[in-house]
């Protein structure tokens, strides 16, 4: 893989800049946007970026940092899903707490925002409190967003309980957008000043990157990733007016800046040190880019990937037509097409060939996989196994120089598994999934040296690209994710079944 980003340089620059910002205050409330862990988008568009860079940065500053996690009560009620992991936001909070503790980081508490006694939220609060985790309930802020006098009063932020913190940097994070991070920071700022403490607010968001051009593919890829939020990148006019310098930000931050500035000035009783929304940020990711061409190409591929993802989400009913069209339009505006993703044409051509040969209207799943050396392999679904499993077996055979004719998994192992699924468990679909095939392969590896060699090649699939001609099940997608494979799908179901397609 060609590297376009210097991770070590970025970590050094970023930690230094945060410490410089905190020096101005007794306490800095740092709103962390995006993903704190497993930032797969950043990893894809910035080749060389560590997906856990943010948490490693915090680990570096661990003596000075504690963390507050926000979760919007409405997201608990409607079981909002974190798309890249397929888990609900409340479950993601539990995972996040475990991961933060694994990095020796102190989790202060969980804040439930816009709380109004929702039943499912109360169950989640009980779960946390009975495990010894502090929970604060923040109701919707009266007067927000326009009535600044009410917002900054005992009727507004004053109604929220004060969260006791002890360290100079308080990171406020969440599973996703719209979780109430900003409101929590400002509420704390209000309480700090009421207590006579000098506190500050800053924002750490990786995208859009303020110091790369507005129409750079890296920033366009961010728009593509947030089509459902209707985010649009813009030139920060406040920054240009103040410094005569061009900086990129996004519409929500620019639109909310005048009110946010007034709220901060009302809380502190003095003129804000921030002249623009860009001023509020501490992001230094742009300084880690070492090869702009590599980043541009990776970002273009991400735009195509996002168009596929949005098309599948539209088919599943998760997004509206406007979102679907916007993702497609962004791709077309960059003069890109689906076929610019190398694995798309081989998958589609093989699927068309199979359909012609079978002379049936049935859809056959074909998965194409591009290896590190540029080789493209395909696998098809059959009565025995899914297309994902077939292509993985073909890939490990390729890496291990094992002939196609050699079976890695003995029928003695496969047949009892299929019988178990069909007869004992009564499964409608008996074809083995990718995960089931990998488990069967690991069993064979205990007695078969060839299978053992093939098993050893699985880590080589990390970073590979794949495309499926049909929508994959959640389990198949998660198995590919665990293997480190980026997969896209055509927005077509394998059959007319409504339940068994999932």
From Swiss-Prot:
It holds the Pfam family DUF1846_C. HAMAP family: UPF0371. InterPro entries: DUF1846 (IPR014999), DUF1846_C (IPR048441), DUF1846_N (IPR048496). It comes from the Bacteria. This is UPF0371 protein CLI_0399. NCBIfam families: PRK13663.1. Belongs to the UPF0371 family.
